[in-house]
Amino acid sequence: MNIKEYIKQWAESYKTDLTENIMPFWMEHGWDKVNGGVYTCLDRDGSLIDSTKSVWFQGRFAFICAYAYNNVEKNPMWLEAAKSTLDFIEKHCFDENGRMYFSVTAEGKPLRMRRYVFSETFAAIAMSEYALATGEQKYAERALQIFKDTQRFLTTPGILAPKFEESVQLQSHSIIMILINVASCIRKVINDPKLTEQIDESIAKLKKYFIHPEFKCLLETVGMNGEFVDTCMGRTINPGHCIETSWFVLDVAKQRGWDKEITDMALQIFDWSWDWGWDKQYGGIINFRDCRNLPVQDYSQDMKFWWPQTETIIASLYAYLATGDDEYIYKHQRISEWTYAHFPDAEFGEWYGYLHRDGTVAQPAKGNLFKGPFHIPRMMIKAYSLCQEILNKEV
């Protein structure tokens, strides 16, 4: 394989697919030019099947529009859509205490509040990316404010409803990993010691509590001191989630001059998670595994969702950038060939989200409250940038 040519071809493919397929699909079918914001509950052909708006995706869509503008093409429509969606967020998606809703109506009336803070994290990265695109410092300051509010919600007893009764003392991987990415995004536009502290704290927790060498995995749920919890929940491995974490950590390692300890930790997470996640029979990254190889409780455990594949594409390129090891190019080739053979919809555009284990389509909708314009375009933008970095490094 001529790696340089391989990377060049993928760079062009990511840019073309993003600008001619993915972004136009959501600009035409998702962006609400009447109320602002974005619809994500779309059928295969882009027609609206539910006008409920996911607040996660208000932030995610605004982020993607600004992220594409900053890294791929200075398309003014993308910036306009980002601004429209940020305005919708500010007008409709916060309650009087600064908490964000999970879903709202088309016009922005509140529908549901949930006990976690993912809406806040996505709004924060949207504000920071828009600040980077426009130079408007007020958005950077707003991003930092939302981030600090999120930290307060997580650490102040009584603000967030507990997931379990007091007798159950567990901690989850998801919020710890996402805050690495949120803080990394905001640090691009504003300096505050809380951001670096959060990154350091999250990485330390992953290393101390969630990485379990006895199973060669990163667990989703552990005890408060990292104890292995021998239940269905405690044994769960989410390979796609762990692989996403690996590239978030590689991002930090790169920012710190390829800090060896952090780089090695990220590569270990990726390598282990690939081994758990790659389906040797059918290909692709599987949803869930049990660290003791017992039956997995989640009913979607053997399905192939869109986002673990996109995160693996990013992580394999990032691992190659970090190491120059051809093994990661071959992993990129394997995941890319499988993903692009099964997920894209050649007739109506965009990608399917949910496949059976063998790669057949489970349901054809292009979006819902959890799938929309985020993982796929983020992959294309990040992978395009990584390809450029790899090519520049090899010159």
Q: Model regions: which residues?
A:
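Glycan-recognition and catalytic cores of secretory/periplasmic carbohydrate-active enzymes
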Residues: 1-395
